[in-house]
Structures are given as structure tokens and as C-alpha cells.
């Protein structure tokens, strides 16, 4: 344990915390432009083709981001809003796109967790009604 005299001379060492989303630069979200939209296979026990995009952010950094939800309308040069928070089974993906903002459409027919996927309240019921009319 340090003596009072040692603390006066040097002080306590500050603990540095590493950010999990350094490309955001301390901001909660960042705007960016899609440069590439692809799919990616997840890690070992899972199996699918997860939708991923490469995005150039407004601060000049390029990051790989996950596109959540079923289906999307993104293509090259689409403007997107991203936030921190990766996907457990996709290595190197530490950001995700916010659905329902800028050029990104919300998920159609979504009933639960609508705010996460940019789905409007009545849209799910209208989609279900349209499906039943087709049958």
C-alpha cells in the first residue's frame, strides 16, 4: 500500500478501458454509406447465411456491420445509421445497422420487438390481412 507521501508525489494510476466500438468515436450512432453488401457464414454450431455490409462512416473509417431482421433493401451507396453491438457468431462484426432510418426500410410483418426493427404498428396486421386475401 502506498504511503500518503507517495500518493502526493505520484497519485493513483487511472484504469484505461478499451472501447468495444472504437469506430464510433464516443458517439451513440454514426451515419455511413454502404460500399459492399454480402453474406457471411456464422461460427461453428450455427448454420445460415447472415447478411453483412461494409460501411464507410462519416468519420472516414470502414467497418463491417450486421443487417438484422428478415430481408433488406440495402445495396451499394445506401445511406445507413449504425450502432455498436456485434453478433456473437460472426467474428469481426462489432456493429449493427439501425432498421427504419435513412435508406434502410423496416422489417415487414414484424409484430414483436418492432422498435428494434423499424416496423410500424399497423403494418404487421395489414401484411397478415393481405396474405389471407391472396389465399
From Swiss-Prot:
Biased composition (Low complexity): 124-135
One GO cellular component term: small ribosomal subunit
Keyword terms, alphabetized: Methylation, Ribonucleoprotein, Ribosomal protein, RNA-binding, rRNA-binding, tRNA-binding
InterPro entries the record matches: NA-bd_OB-fold, Ribosomal_uS12, Ribosomal_uS12_bac
One GO term (biological process): translation
Gene3D superfamilies per record: Nucleic acid-binding proteins (2.40.50.140)
Single GO molecular function: rRNA binding
Covalent S-S links between cysteines: none
Keyword rRNA-binding: yes
Positions of post-translational 3-methylthioaspartic acid modification: 89
Pfam families: Ribosom_S12_S23
Region (Disordered): 114-135
Matches recorded under NCBIfam families: rpsL_bact
Family: Belongs to the universal ribosomal protein uS12 family.
Description of how the protein assembles with itself and partners: Part of the 30S ribosomal subunit. Contacts proteins S8 and S17. May interact with IF1 in the 30S initiation complex.
Role description: With S4 and S5 plays an important role in translational accuracy. Interacts with and stabilizes bases of the 16S rRNA that are involved in tRNA selection in the A site and with the mRNA backbone. Located at the interface of the 30S and 50S subunits, it traverses the body of the 30S subunit contacting proteins on the other side and probably holding the rRNA structure together. The combined cluster of proteins S8, S12 and S17 appears to hold together the shoulder and platform of the 30S subunit.
Protein name: Small ribosomal subunit protein uS12
Organism: Amoebophilus asiaticus (strain 5a2)
